Amino acid sequence: MKASRAKPKRAPAAKKAAAQKKKHKIFTPRRTRRKVAAKRASKRKPNAQAARKAAAIASLPGVVVGGRIGPRYAEILSRDALVFLAGLHRRFDGKRRDLLAARSERQKRFNAGELPDFPPETRHIRDNDSWRVAPIPADLTDRRVEITGPVDRKMIVNALNSGATHYMADFEDANSPTWANNIEGQINLKDRWQGQIDFTDPHTKKRYAIGPKPAVLIVRPRGWHLSEAHLTVDGEPISGALFDFGLFFFHNAKAQLAHGSGPYFYLPKLESRHEARLWNEVFLFAQDTLGIPKGSIRATVLIETLPAAFEMDEILWEMRDHIVGMNAGRWDYIFSFIKTFAKNSNYVLPDRSQVVMGEGFLGGYASLLVRTCHRRGAFAMGGMAAQIPIKNDSQANAAAFAKVRADKEREVRDGYDGTWVAHPDLVPVAKEVFDRLMPQPNQTDRVRLHVRVLRDDLLKIHKGTKTEAGVRLNIRVGVQYIDAWLRGRGAVPIYNLMEDAATAEISRAQIWQWIKYGAVLEGGVKVTAEFFQRALRQEMQVVKREVGAANYARGRFPEAIKLFRELSLSREFVPFLTIPAYELMLTGSFG
């Protein structure tokens, strides 16, 4: 046991000041107003300014900022920005909650045996060949390689300089939504448009600066189901989606337009045309409030839920003045498939490594997305290549890159207009494929009207096996990811792949499904709660050896293990692991 370090006693006045600071969660100067040396005064000045701004924040009626106000936080959480956020919340949060309730009701029908299908009441939208989405902005017409990642300063500069055509700055699956990550990410993105993003790493002393041709910036806010607990409006936490979107749009939209670009977004986790309609209403309100022309906001919708796959035309229709394309978010889509059929034993999947694009329900989904988008003049974006360089094994690295190359060649042949990568070293690999097979900016002219995808094509189970190795890999990956997420990291390298929340969701969902239906693995072992708990204990010893005992002890593995266990053994399927994980992050407990 480490010896505890004695803390110096505080004077009564200091205790009182500390208590007040904790109570109000605002940044206060460390010193009083007595005269000090000019050097100390210059250091104190921005702190005093932050305190004055924080006091202004605290006086805004109905709005409470519960997170600390660190350096430059008040610049993002300005009074005008908070008024804008409050307006978004008061106008749209009720509708958001109604839509989340509608999700729950729809899931009850699926649990009772109903199968997803194309809505008969919107057949006229799907059958009408005359409508198209609005013309695509010039800097979105060639999106052959997009790099994605979290919003820390180093990642932003490296992504902008990566050679990719576009960079998706992610507040969602690749971001752990700590208060610091969210606000400092907003500071970093604002600095990009103010020309102040260049910096020197304090540890390595390496200089980072944006090059002459940076990637076009696109931002992904959180999904409709997540909240931002550190900001409440009229006593309710604001939607994470409105928080992320609102702050970025408020601070950057006009600067983006002035630079010849625009406020561009990726929208995650939509499940219906009604949820798309809500985003469209948010866009109209935001543009009108800031005096920005209608249609300035442009969005790409990730089709990463099974219900949304049956409403692609309808989503494009609802957002036709603001949408530019759709993306095949394959990892979350697999998770959504498991969740949709949580109570249906006819849809138990094989090892997730065997659920591949081009086959089963993913094959139908991929074909339908391209056909639907191109028919409406929108882009079809391919999925993520999560591989990262394997520095100590050139043969394994070459094999990994060959796998990426083959996947991107499939995407081009299928008609996709661009793709995603998670690491800068994969940009030239993907770019070479698209340059070779798609010399023009895009292939939206490949309409593929001959393609017909029916309901059963979107529900076709992949053939494959269930293995003990698959169970154990799911355990190791899922727990390691949750541990990192709880410590503030949302994009995590695990076994030579850059993992985000989607992989953790698949991992725990597949184990839950196999336990519930007593899946029999190759070799005859039946997946039971007892088998899972034994494997969990064994695999955590493997993880401890892999990461090292010291790193394991410094992590949050006990909490991650408990959460992973409870999600996997829960009687009812928990819709999103990030909801109890966020509660755990904030309070130290969940449930």
Language model regions located:
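Expand to "…catalyze enediolate/carbanion chemistry for C-C bond making/breaking, isomerization
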Residues: 39-40, 52-591
